[in-house]
Swiss-Prot record:
Pathway: Porphyrin-containing compound metabolism; protoporphyrin-IX biosynthesis; coproporphyrinogen-III from 5-aminolevulinate: step 2/4. Coiled coil: none annotated. One of its GO terms (molecular function) is hydroxymethylbilane synthase activity. Tetrapolymerization of the monopyrrole PBG into the hydroxymethylbilane pre-uroporphyrinogen in several discrete steps. HAMAP family: Porphobil_deam. This is Porphobilinogen deaminase. Binds 1 dipyrromethane group covalently. Monomer. It catalyses: 4 porphobilinogen + H2O = hydroxymethylbilane + 4 NH4(+). Signal peptide: none annotated. GO terms for cellular component: cytoplasm. GO terms for biological process: protoporphyrinogen IX biosynthetic process. PANTHER family: PORPHOBILINOGEN DEAMINASE (PTHR11557:SF0). It comes from Paenibacillus macerans.
């Protein structure tokens, strides 16, 4: 095998660069361990979502805002792969591109960062809470209808700065981003799924590459976490059937459980002695309005996560969830 430099596209935010560098570090270790002659370099790309910061996500085009320019660079051969936050990836990828690998998922929860150190239920009546998504707004208002939800855009560091400078009582951010940046000490409280169900794929990364790049796909397969890939596939199919983007409050979280309802050992991975058939996927899904939400839960065999996500979405729609 000849030596090759793999060009990795990424947004230029501090979080995007940090998680891309972490992935490259892991891939370098895997390449050394398997004797693969690959090097990696980073190419920064500005996306539409990075350029437009004064408008809410729901008003500027929905899903794909943070990936379209990167995907085009991949199709044009300017880059070979890209590291995305999975929650930013559209449920349907452009022809010629695939999700080549899904590393082990980090914390999927949302995190509350409060100026006063108060938890969500302790915030004063009419507290100003900053968030960037309709998904969070819908669920927070279902939990605390008195809250004043206001949009806050920008990178993690700029949102944290706005918390101090713009008079918010609190802001909501994805826990995984704060943890990847080493900023867990800023978190006041983590929000449970019954209060704020996470975005599809939240906490997971997607490594996108060209479908015809067999050499790179072989490398990425070494980095893929099968259990994360299964659960994220179910969530993404749920989203695709609902045809949702940033304009609709949609959330979903899937995890693996043993047939008796117990979660797998080892941080979400199946123990080596477990038979795959003993595991089931459990998915909780939500589609809501600006001030309400509806839930449906179910479970199925782990072998068919895509069909499962589709079935759960169909059942939720039949029970009254409507995406308009």
């Amino acid at each position: 095998m000849t030596k090759r430099t793999i060009v990795v596209g990424t947004r230029q935010s501090q979080l995007a660069l940090t998680q891309t560098e972490q992935v490259i570090g892991d891939l370098k270790e895997l390449c050394r361990a398997h004797g693969l002659p690959f090097e990696f370099e980073i190419k920064k790309i500005v996306t539409k979502g990075d350029r437009i910061l004064d408008v809410t996500l729901s008003k500027i085009g929905g899903k794909g805002l943070f990936v379209k320019e990167i995907e085009q660079a991949m199709l044009d051969g300017e880059i070979d792969m890209a590291v995305h936050s999975m929650k930013d990836m559209p449920s349907v990828l452009p022809e010629g591109l695939i999700n080549g690998g899904v590393p082990l998922r980090k914390d999927p929860r949302d995190a509350l960062i409060s100026r006063s150190g108060l938890h969500l239920h302790e915030l004063p009546q009419g507290a100003r809470v900053g968030t960037s998504t309709l998904r969070r707004s819908s669920q927070l208002l279902a939990y605390r209808p008195d809250l004043v939800l206001e949009p806050v855009r920008g990178n993690i560091d700029s949102r944290l700065r706005k918390l101090e400078e713009e008079g918010f009582d609190a802001i909501i951010l994805a826990a995984a981003g704060l943890q990847r940046m080493g900023w867990e000490n800023r978190v006041t409280a983590y929000l449970s799924a019954d209060v704020c169900l996470p975005a599809v794929g939240q906490g997971a990364l997607g490594i996108e590459c060209r479908e015809n790049d067999a050499e790179l796909r072989d490398v990425l397969s070494l980095y893929n976490d099968p259990d994360t890939a299964l659960t994220v596939a179910a969530e993404r199919r749920f989203l695709a059937v609902l045809n949702g983007g940033c304009q609709v409050p949609i959330a979903a979280y899937a995890n693996l459980e043993r047939a008796g309802g117990q979660a797998p050992e080892e941080g979400g991975r199946a123990a080596a002695s477990q038979a795959p058939a003993a595991l089931r996927i459990r998915l909780t899904g939500m589609v809501g309005s600006a001030d309400g939400r509806g839930y449906f839960e179910g479970e199925c065999r782990r072998e068919d996560p895509v069909a499962f996500g589709e079935r759960i979405a169909g059942l939720l729609l039949a029970q009254g969830g409507r995406v308009t």
